[in-house]
Amino acid sequence: MNKLVARQRLVMTFTFFSMFFGAGNLIFPPFVGAQAGSATIPAAIGFIVSAVGLPILGVLAVTFAGGFDKLASRVSPKFALFLGVAIMLTIGPCFAIPRTATTSFEMMVAPFVPSSYGWLAQLIYSLVFFTLAFLFAQHPEKLSKVLGRFMGPLLLVLIAVLFIACLIHGIGIPANPMGDYSTNQIARGFLDGYQTMDLLAALYFGIVISANIRAQQVDDESQVQKETAYAGLGTGVLLIVIYGALSYVGVVSGAIATIDPTKDTGATVLTNLTSSLFGTFGTAFLGIVFVIACLNVCTGLIGTCATYFHTRFRTVAGRTLSYRTWQVIFTVFSFIVSNAGLSAIIKVSVPVLSALYPIAIVLVLLTLTHKSLGARFPRVYFWTVLLVGIASFATCISSLVAVFGGSIGWLDAALAMLPLQQYQLGWVIPAILGVAIGIADAPRR
């Protein structure tokens, strides 16, 4: 078979879509809409570029390169290992796994518990949640085969119901842009798109799409790339429609109830809306859907991270660590992190993602232009990633210190000298400079 038929392409599109859309993706677009208010359109455009466009380009890049390791090894094999570990820790126990517990807690339990008992309720909930996740992770196929069939459609139905209810309710008077969205809405939306972590996931899991296409007897590599592009285009259209609808939902919610951008999250926006439109039943139903979906995602991530580290680090400090041991480590660590709360996890994850995302972006762009650039000037990978890495990690350190109420004067002053740094895009000029140095470095090799 040289190409897929329409039905197979549709299946690939929904497979692609299911990789990138989960319960966690539901909370960010509404928060963008609630904060941006009357300026939601430019904010949503920025969000869609980074939350939809970049992940799809990432999958294409991994397909063209033949896998994540081959792509990242163009910088160096050690860098490929470092970036792989950083990505797995980010989409695993440091941020994404704990976020599944905190998100579902905020949706299911927090609205019904007095704030004075919130910390105790979260402790008990996260203990039960991660115990179940660990048990399900021993036999993930039993959970995924059942939940995977209906959770995606159920989430889509839920979004449709919320959107239609908002259309019937009417938008009212949109709130004025607030917080970080008071100015530069496109740039802020672009940066908040990092929170989905889908580009990082695309770099590591993107090869799965091309493998599924090859399993349909498509053996010509150029056709595999075309079919991947078709699936990516279809997925992009779906995500744009969904994120646009959810942003509108956020605008309506923001007009109904005022939020505090420094304390509230997208979960707060959704619970405010469902409580207003559907009462207690609506809030409880939304919470149940989130718990089931988040539990399914958490189970898969625990297994994925354990498999990755068991494969690459069979011994640590002279001791052999089994697959089950890695599962225990990641489950316990995620339980501890989750009790910091959703807002705290998001605040800390933003600086970390600001370090990883620019590196991922330039890797993707260099891979997509490999034939005309990287193949002729191999050193562009090294120099571009090096300079972007310096700029983005400096930004990460500065932002992390600021999260905890401190500052590093000389570092902040140095970063302020970078063009576009006011938009958190200070890595762009170093990237261009890295390409130029990489091209100039080629004759000396």
Regions found by a protein language model. Name each.
Residues V11-F21, A165-G172, Y181-L246, F285-C298, ...:
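Hydrophobic, membrane-embedded alpha-helices of multi-pass small-molecule transporters
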Residues V32, T102-A121, R214-A215, C298-V328:
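Helix-loop-helix connectors at the membrane interface of multi-pass transporters/channels
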Residues G53, L57, L154-C166, T228-A255, ...:
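Selective recognition of specific alpha-helical transmembrane segments in multi-pass small-molecule
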Residues T63-L71, F129-M151, A215-V218, F335-K347, ...:
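Membrane-water interface regions at transmembrane-helix termini and the short interhelical loops
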Residues P93, I97, L156-Y181, L199-L200, ...:
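Hydrophobic alpha-helical segments and their helix-loop junctions in multi-pass secondary transporters
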Residues F136-C166, S349-I361, V380-I390:
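Membrane-interface loop-to-helix entry segments
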Residues H139-F150, I186-G189, I209-L238, I256-T271, ...:
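Hydrophobic, small-residue-rich membrane helices and short re-entrant helix-turn-helix hairpins
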Residues H169, M178, G189, P378-R445:
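A generic transmembrane alpha-helix motif of multi-pass inner-membrane proteins
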